[in-house]
């Protein structure tokens, strides 16, 4: 089973946040479409997407705060977040979800 551990912890700028991400493929393996696992526990953090993202919730509930509204997904449900969105990811308790991003090399497009 694919999982995450402390080596996959994401730096959100807040040391109390518990966010873990693990890419499933390298850019060499999948140069256009990125995919990975994300797990969060009792955390809310801001994020601006310069890529399109779909999140498939495996367990728990994922809330995305966007433009003053909250969209939520539970197990077996999918969220779509369009490129250019300034959001806040939020989880109460624990959630595990798969993310799919296009383009896969979004980090090289941030300008830094």
Regions found by a protein language model. Name each.
Residues 1-34:
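A short, N-terminal "cap"/entry segment at the start of jelly-roll beta-barrel domains
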Residues 25, 34-38, 55, 98:
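Conserved hydrophobic/aromatic positions in well-ordered beta-strands
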Residues 29-30, 46-47, 89:
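Short glycine/serine/proline-enriched coil/turn segments at secondary-structure junctions
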Residues 49, 56, 75, 83, ...:
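Conserved strand-loop elements at the edges of beta-sheets that form or border functional pockets
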Residues 83-107:
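Ligand-binding loop in jelly-roll beta-barrel domains
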Residues 109-112:
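Short, charged, solvent-exposed linker or helix-capping segments at domain edges/interfaces
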